Amino acid sequence: MANLEIIDQKGKSAGNVDLNEEIFGIEPNESVVFDAIIRQRAGKRQGTSAVKNRSAVRGGGKKPWRQKGTGRARQGSIRAPQWRGGGTVFGPTPRSYKMDMPRKARRLAMKSVLSQKVADNDLIILDQLTLEAPKTKELKAILDNANVSGKVLVVSDDKNVQLSGKNLPKVKVVPVNGLNVVDAVDYQKLVLTQDAIKRIEEVLA
């Protein structure tokens, strides 16, 4: 079972915590993580691109010229695909890009990412993370005290913390139920509180 140090908001040691080995100590499955990332990004696609085919383009009801006798190639409509202003063949139509993925696989992907963070020493655990008011400077001080730099993903349900993180470049704050594979992979450091760990273990156990 992984045992990590807990630090307080001033950067001082506040004890240790035992992490669930089945969540924070498994062998990462890169293939499942890749599938989860593709699925999440695909689900965000708007899927509204569309073009008109020959039946949707206005006009073209009359035959341009008679079938025979002109010496030109026969034509039935000025909105056929070969005409300028004609309809498009096999163009995009509105569709959903959402992909299905078994719940077990989605959970395995999240476990793999969390386990990789532990293996790379990129998981920082705070005893708590609360602010009395939205103060960017205070949140930055807490991260500096924890010796956290680079791209940081902070998991917190505190509204003041969420507001404080909006003005910090390379810092993103998400609620516990908003923790996802794409953000966890995109941001190098992951900051969790003890309460967040308990809730994550309840969901993924």
Curated annotation (Swiss-Prot):
Keywords: Ribonucleoprotein, Ribosomal protein, RNA-binding, rRNA-binding. Residues 45-97 are annotated as: Disordered. One of its GO terms (biological process) is translation. InterPro entries: Ribosomal_uL4, Ribosomal_uL4-like, Ribosomal_uL4_dom_sf. Disulfide bonds: none annotated. GO terms for molecular function: rRNA binding; structural constituent of ribosome. Residues 60-71 have a biased composition (Basic residues). SUPFAM superfamilies: Ribosomal protein L4. One of its GO terms (cellular component) is ribosome. It comes from the Bacteria. One of the primary rRNA binding proteins, this protein initially binds near the 5'-end of the 23S rRNA. It is important during the early stages of 50S assembly. It makes multiple contacts with different domains of the 23S rRNA in the assembled 50S subunit and ribosome. Belongs to the universal ribosomal protein uL4 family. Part of the 50S ribosomal subunit. This is Large ribosomal subunit protein uL4. It comes from Lactobacillus johnsonii (strain CNCM I-12250 / La1 / NCC 533).
